[in-house]
Regions:
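N-terminal subdomain of nucleotide-sugar transferases
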Residues: 1-63, 109, 252-257
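Conserved catalytic-core segment of nucleotide-activated headgroup transferases in glycan assembly
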Residues: 22, 207-279, 289-294, 298-299
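Donor nucleotide-sugar binding/catalytic pocket of nucleotide-sugar-dependent glycosyltransferases
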Residues: 134-135, 164-218
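Acidic donor-binding loop of glycosyltransferase active sites
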Residues: 299-313, 324-326
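Short hydrophobic beta-strand element within catalytic cores of glycosyltransferases
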Residues: 317-320, 327-331
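Conserved acidic donor-binding segment of nucleotide-sugar-dependent glycosyltransferases
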Residues: 346-353, 360-361
Length: 361
């Protein structure tokens, strides 16, 4: 079997400055299941250096060819002029072209499958008519902005509404441009696949759950004593800021009843203020902005909290927690597309009050 992957990012074991882990582990699975030869053509937007690229080639036994981004795009990034994308009809990276010499090289291999990773590159399938093409999106970006426009807290200002409406229009325009009935569009989100199909009736959309990868199958599930270790993971950013503020405000209010039973850790950037707040009101709290071995640090805790307000697809940090034996307390968006059951293998909550109630149970 011969497979050619065209990707925005260079595959890596864990996400590195992009959603680069999914293709890595899919390639690894293919290699274990078939006698497969894999060539990767990467725009390397996650900026791996030569040594890192060679290491990935060695780990997966693949060949990686680097592709150039347009010079104007590189200049725009270098001069921090990304805001100029508002003058473009399509999303920024969709302007990455595939030179004819690489098209010819790929065709000469007679690959069984042309695999494209990243929605912005989906239009590259046009170069390989007659070949079996699969595009791993992996999320539907237009659904993300559609969801944003439905959030009251995200649309309080006119500028916000215009920003999300414009991005929605960009991705919808791109989807109309590239969607072909003889190409398979692969998603790791059920609603992503359904929304894409709804908006593009001729689309052949496929939903497959995101694979687990970095996990410890031998971990003994047992809460720490005398204090249960509660973990907030991921960057404190727009995706989770509103929900996390709600959860943590309620936690702060209930300090008298909970500070004796829970130890709090924030693992990720941006949590400094909340760590200081909880520490001042009596919680045992610490902030780890970066862990050299993320999985090892994860396994030191009992419960993982993910208050994600909006998003699409599958949330990698949530998958990591489940795979490593932590009880996940999370919002519906945090837990979507993961094969778990509320009250059995996870606890699903919608707001800060429900979060606190789950800690008292």
């Amino acid at each position: 079997m011969r497979l050619t992957l065209i990707s925005l990012s260079t595959p890596t074991f864990n996400n590195c400055r992009a959603a680069s882990a999914l293709p890595y582990h899919l390639i690894s699975s293919v290699k274990k299941s078939f006698s497969a030869s894999v060539d990767v053509y990467s725009y390397n937007i996650n900026e791996l250096d030569t040594n890192q690229i060679e290491q990935v080639e060695k780990e997966l036994n693949i060949t990686i060819h680097l592709l150039d981004k347009p010079k104007w795009l590189k200049l725009m990034m270098m001069l921090h002029l990304v805001f100029l994308r508002v003058f473009l009809k399509y999303p920024l990276y969709s302007y990455c072209s595939l030179p004819q010499k690489h098209i010819d090289a790929i065709k000469s291999t007679h690959s069984d499958v042309i695999w494209i990773y990243g929605e912005e590159l989906a239009n590259h399938s046009k170069y390989f008519e007659g070949s079996k093409c699969i595009v791993t999106m992996p999320d539907c970006e237009s659904l993300y902005y559609y969801r944003m426009l439905r959030q009251p807290w995200a649309t309080m200002r006119l500028l916000q509404i215009l920003k999300y409406a414009f991005a929605y229009w960009q991705y919808k325009s791109l989807e109309r441009l590239f969607c072909e009935k003889d190409v398979i569009y692969h998603f790791v989100g059920k609603e992503d696949a359904d929304f894409f199909k709804l908006m593009n009736g001729q689309a052949n959309s496929l939903f497959m759950r995101h694979p687990l990868y970095a996990y410890n199958s031998e971990k003994t599930i047992k809460f720490h004593q005398p204090k249960i270790k509660l973990l907030f993971t991921g960057r404190y950013d727009f995706y989770c800021q509103h929900g996390s503020d709600d959860f943590l405000s309620e936690l702060e209010k209930n300090r008298n009843g909970l500070s004796s039973y829970f130890e709090i850790t924030f693992l990720g950037k941006g949590w400094e203020k909340w760590n200081e707040k909880l520490h001042k009101v009596g919680f045992q709290s610490q902030h780890i902005s970066f862990a050299p071995d993320y999985i090892a640090e994860l396994q030191n805790h009992d419960i993982q909290v993910n208050a994600i307000d909006v998003g699409t697809g599958t949330k990698g940090k949530v998958l990591d927690g489940i795979a490593n034996g932590l009880l996940i307390i999370g919002t519906p968006y945090a837990l979507e597309n993961i094969s778990v059951k509320n009250g059995d293998s996870c606890v699903m909550v919608s707001n800060g009050i429900e979060f606190i109630q789950s800690l008292y149970v």
